[in-house]
Amino acid sequence: MNFEGLHAARVFMGDSLGFHIIFVMFGLTLPILVSWFEWMGIRKNDQKLIDIAKFWSKIMTVLVITGVISGTIIALQMSLVWPGILKFGGEVIGLPFMFETYAFLIEAVFLALYMATWNSKKVSKKMHAVIGLFVVLGSTLSAYAITSINGWMNSPSGFSYVNGNIVNVDVVQAMFSDTALVEFFHSMPAYYFAVSLVVAGLYAFKVMRAKHKDRLTKRFKIDWFIIKRLMFFAAAMFVLLIITADITGKYLAKHEPEKLAAIEVVRETQTNAPLILGGVATEDGRIIAPHIKVPSALSILAGNSPSAEVIGLNEFEKENQPPLVVHTFFDIKLTLIAVLVAILIAFFGAYAFKPKLLANKVLLFSVGISGYLAIAVIELGWMITEIGRQPWAVRGYLTTAEALTKTNDITTFGYLFPFSYLVLFIVTILAVRRIIKDESKNNGVKK
């Protein structure tokens, strides 16, 4: 396979995963939000909240279905384009694939039961809400299984490698490795954070379309109730993200040092390593364009001390060093996070000190777009994770080139994957818009 074929295959896979992660984050978060809305409605004896839960459950069902289709496309792509990964590690990662299947069955069965028993006289409201919790359970277990596979690719464990063969396989260790746990507990709050902001933003846009004098009236009481609850939930998830990000940084410094070195363009192993913000990294590791160096900050983040050693890229063979473009992606990610922090501060500042400012059009618009900025942050995070593993498909054992199919037709049939995702994305948008359009004014966000 020539370089053009390898590059095309990576582009196709990146495109597929970029679309897939959007379906995933909604498929994981909406079950939690729907259950939360329903339980609040039951506790407060508020039919409007229950109706909102029912409204979002319809959208949730669409996104779960499209997520399944998306996942199937990914599985086909893995088998057809990257057969080397399964050939090399199938014996190790077979368990999480099987686990994911059973978890999905739990999710699918209880989702069908959940949707079929809305307003059923044979199922109490509390029992119906309990059924919804099993949907949450199934989706969460499914997410862990798939995340553990990615974690294994980033830091393989659970086997011995003797004479080019995998032996002494411990599938449990591979599935519940430190890498899997770190990735899972960092990515899940990120999904909850982003989707809760998207939903809050839709209600914010709804309020914003009204006249200024009407925005804080009883007409939008339920909308403000949802917005405030979701913004508090998002803030809680953001605090959790700060904690897990710190853990992730320290984990990278110890277990994937070349990735951290590429992110911060650390050429030589050093203590008192600075954190570099901004700039563009050249191939030889120089930083051009305006940038800021925060003295010793990277060492502190990596090991809680300025004297903590940060391993540099020169410790690794040139061909095994990750692309330095991850530094640019990380800077963009930090910039978007700073914008999101500003939006959260503005919202809670207005909420605490001057509630009338909540009706401000600029603030409502900022809340409205915040979820999409958060989605961009997640996309960038996964890009850093995956590109930062290059040139490896399974770090240290199997290169991306070795994992690629030997067929020369990748540039011919490969275009089917982005085309399929484009069609799926359009169909999903149309289906969700139809649900919103058909919903009554009192049952959710209006178009």
Show the residue positions of the predicted features:
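Polytopic transmembrane helical bundles with strong interfacial aromatic enrichment
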Residues: 1-447
